[in-house]
């Protein structure tokens, strides 16, 4: 959670827009609101299974959008993007010149079907991509709170200052 808060502190300013694919953990919304940014939530839909209307998400990303937040595999629904959907989203945020914050802490916890792919497998070095991951979920280390942010190199010093 700290990694998500740090990413929001780096990217969002007052009046910016954050697009969130929901449902999400309530603290995600709080991280956006604390920056005095506006939340535009695109909800997953349920009809026998959870799905994301990709067109709704793409249309929600406007010129005011600075950050798109996606938690896949999703907590609490278990919904998960496939790699072709990830590519479409990544291409769109490139076009819109906004940041993609991918919470991938559950990427190793998949019980049916193919394993979750990471946005990192599709990204280029200059992409505005931030990926949150954690040992807490994947390696059953919840009490340790060990996590990391994969980010463009130029953000490293800024992130280090916020952590300290």
What are these regions (language model features)?
Residues 34-40:
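A short helix-loop-beta submotif of the ANL/AMP-binding
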Residues 40, 44-112:
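Active-site phosphate-binding strand-loop segment of PLP-dependent enzymes
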Residues 16, 37, 95-99, 125-127:
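A short helix->loop->beta-strand "cap" motif at the edges of active sites that frequently abuts
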Residues 122-164:
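Conserved core segment of the aminotransferase class I/II
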Residues 11, 31-32, 93:
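Short hydrophobic alpha-helical segments of the AMP-binding
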Residues 1-17:
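Phosphate-binding glycine-rich loop
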Residues 1-4, 24-28:
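Conserved coil-to-alpha-helix start sites within the AMP-binding
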């Amino acid at each position: 959670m700290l990694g998500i808060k740090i990413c929001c502190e780096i990217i969002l300013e007052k009046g910016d827009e954050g697009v969130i694919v929901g449902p999400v953990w309530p603290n995600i919304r709080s991280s956006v609101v604390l920056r005095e940014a506006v939340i535009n939530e695109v909800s997953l839909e349920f009809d026998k299974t959870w799905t994301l209307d990709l067109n709704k998400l793409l249309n929600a990303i406007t010129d005011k959008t600075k950050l798109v937040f996606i938690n896949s595999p999703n907590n609490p629904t278990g919904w998960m993007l496939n790699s072709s959907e990830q590519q479409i989203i990544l291409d769109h945020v490139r076009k819109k010149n906004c940041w993609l914050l991918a919470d991938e802490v559950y990427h190793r916890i998949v019980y049916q079907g193919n394993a979750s792919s990471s946005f990192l497998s599709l990204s280029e070095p200059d992409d505005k991509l931030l990926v949150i991951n954690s040992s807490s979920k994947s390696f059953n280390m919840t009490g340790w709170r060990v996590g990391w942010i994969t980010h463009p190199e130029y953000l490293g010093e800024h992130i280090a200052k916020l952590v300290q």
